[in-house]
Amino acid sequence: MQTIRNVHVRRVAAPIERVRPWIETCWSGGDRDCFPRDVIADWRKNPPGADPLALIPGETLVGHGPFRFRLRAWDGVVWRVDVVGSRGGWHGFHLQPDGDGCRVTHTVELESTLSARLGWMAIEPIHDWAVEALFDRLEHALRTGVVPERTERPMSRVAAFALGLARGARSRRPKARPSAPMGW
């Protein structure tokens, strides 16, 4: 079976040792999270009793929008999560030395079923914007020591339209009815 593969690469002017902590805090929802969380909410969840910011292979769940991922590996160079749910695949980062800087590669690979291809066509513009925005925010954090509060990268009309459709579809889902009070 063929796979859907999407790759983004950015060279940053900092060595791996300085990039690594920023990758570790992605999808944490905190102020050191480089994901464009001011536009698309993200989160991280660990088992009860574990440090909420820990990265525990096989246990840590991360996500954004309707997407959930389980951490497979993080060794300080390769950060990889598996897609949770009906779509098989993974995404992750690979850090490589590049002179006095670091090359950051973000890759997504998904099973190429018909439904996956159709779904990917809808979300690819949003995904591409989010990865490039994350890279922008990472570079800002490396320069200043702080992740910007607002994501400055403009969103293409196609990505904005797709994000609006995704948000509208989510808001139109039927809400669960509250259970009836006792005595009814």
Language-model-detected regions and their locations in the chain:
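Glycine-rich loops and low-complexity Gly/Arg-rich segments
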Residues: R32-R37, L95-P97, H106-V108, D128-A133
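Short acidic, gly/pro-rich beta-turn/loop elements at beta-sheet edges
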Residues: R20, D31, H91-F93, L114-A116
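Hydrophobic pocket/interface hotspot
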Residues: V19-G29, L71, W79, V104-H106, ...
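Hydrophobic-ligand binding "helix-grip"
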Residues: P57-T105, E109-T113, G168-W184
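Hydrophobic ligand-binding cavity/cleft-lining segments
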Residues: M1-P52, A160-W184
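Short, low-complexity, polar/charged sequence segments that are solvent-exposed and flexible
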Residues: W27-D31, W90, G99-D100, I123-D128
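A conserved amphipathic terminal alpha-helix motif
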Residues: L110-R177
